[in-house]
Amino acid sequence: MYREPVRVRPLGPRDVDAVCARVEARVAAAAARSTALVGTLDHDELRAVVSAVTPAWVARSRGRVVGHLVTTMIDRTQRRAWIPPDGASFDDPAVLRGLLDAAASVWRDAGASGYAAWVYDEPTEVDAWATCGATLSARRGVRALSFPADRGTPAGFDLRRAGPGDLETALTLDRWGDPPGGRPPDEQERRDEVASLLEDPDIDYLIAELGGRALAQAVVMPLAPRRGSRAPAVHLSAVAVDPDRRGRGLGTALVESVLERARRAGHVVAEVNWRTVDPRVERFWRGRGFTPTQALVERPLPV
C-alpha cells in the first residue's frame, strides 16, 4: 500500500513532461511483452496530446507525479467514461483509487453512470483495477500477419464480400453472434447497424458459404493509427457461425481465410475483442494465434 501523502488535482502544464515519460515507459513495457505492439512514440506528438487533453488528473507525492488519469470521451449512449490503455498510470492501487475518486464527480456531471477502461493485460495492472471495484469483461488480442495461413478450408467453402442485397442473410448470421445469456440488441437498431456496415465501402462484410449456404460471417474494418500499435492493421468483429456447425472447423476456416485476405491486402496486424464470460471463446481466439494485449475493465460509479 502506498504510504506517502498523495494529492490529486487537474493536470497542469508543469505535469506534462512527467506524464509523457510515464506513458512512454508503459508503451515500451507493453511492446516488450508483445512483438505486435510498437514500443516507441513520437514525443512531440504525445506532448501535444497530453497538453490538450481534458478532463485529466495527476497524482503527486513529494514533488513528483505518481499517477495520471485521462478520459478520452464520455459515451452518452452507454453513459460511460472511456479510458484508453495509456490513459492511466499509478505507482500503487491506492493512487489509482484516489484518481478515480477525483474523476467520479466530473464524470457524473458529464452524464456518465460508470467507466470503462482498456488497460494493459498484465496481472498486477488488472488486479489493481479489481481492488478499485472494476470487473474484467473483455480482452483484446493481436496477431501478426507475417505468413500465409497454414490451414486448409472444407470442400465447398467460399468467402465473399456481402452487399446491401444481403441484408436479410446478414441479419440471420448476426443473431448467431449474440452472446449466450446476454441481452440482444433492439432489432431495429440491429437492422440499421448491419445495413450501414453493408453499405460502407471501407468495411468488408464477409460471408462464408458452404455448398452455397451462408453459415458464418465476419466484419473486417481498417484501423486508424493508434499510439503503440502497428499499422496498417485491421479489426475483426461480428464473427458468427451457425450454431449447428460449431466445433467442426468452420470458425477456424472463416478466421484463417479472413486473415489471409487481410494479409494479401497489405495489413500487417489483426486484432479482435472477445468477452471473457465464455472460456470457449477465449480458447478459440488464443488457438487462432491472438495474444491478449489489453483488457477491458468496467464499473458503475458509486452512488
What does each model-identified segment do?
Residues 155-234:
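Flexible, substrate/cofactor-facing loop regions flanked by secondary structure
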Residues 1-4, 87-155, 294-302:
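Acyl-donor-binding surface of acyltransferase catalytic domains
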Residues 115-119, 236, 270-274:
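Conserved hydrophobic beta-strand within the GNAT/NAT acetyltransferase core sheet
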Residues 7-21, 30-33, 158-172:
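A short beta-loop-alpha structural element at the N-terminal edge
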Residues 127-129, 285, 290:
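Conserved active-site tyrosine of GNAT-family acetyltransferases
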